[in-house]
Amino acid sequence: MKLLYLFLAILLAIEEPVISGKHHILRCMGNSGICRASCKKNEQPYLYCRNYQHCCLQSYMRISISGEEENTDWSYEKQWPRLP
């Protein structure tokens, strides 16, 4: 019987306590997105996370696939060509 109590004590010490209502949020794309089974209305799915869920990014996020940091200056001159 003592062995059973010792086994239960060790098992409870190893297990992480379960806290209801709190879920670990898995982040993706350099902490810009959230891994979800389905994206919200204002989010776009982009690639997949480690748990095969969608990496959901806000629709206004710009993604550079070249790996280089882009200049994100949104001035008027850079958006439209100059008129002669």
From Swiss-Prot:
This is Beta-defensin 119. The gene is DEFB119. GO terms for molecular function: lipopolysaccharide binding. The keyword Nucleotide-binding does not apply. Keywords: Antibiotic, Antimicrobial, Defensin, Disulfide bond, Secreted, Signal. Belongs to the beta-defensin family. Has antibacterial activity. GO terms for biological process: antifungal innate immune response; defense response to Gram-negative bacterium; defense response to Gram-positive bacterium. Disulfide bonds join C28-C55, C35-C49, C39-C56. PANTHER family: BETA-DEFENSIN 119 (PTHR47902:SF1). Its main location: secreted. Pfam families: Defensin_big (PF14862). It is found in: Secreted. It comes from Hylobates lar (Lar gibbon). Residues 1-21 form the signal peptide. One of its GO terms (cellular component) is extracellular region.
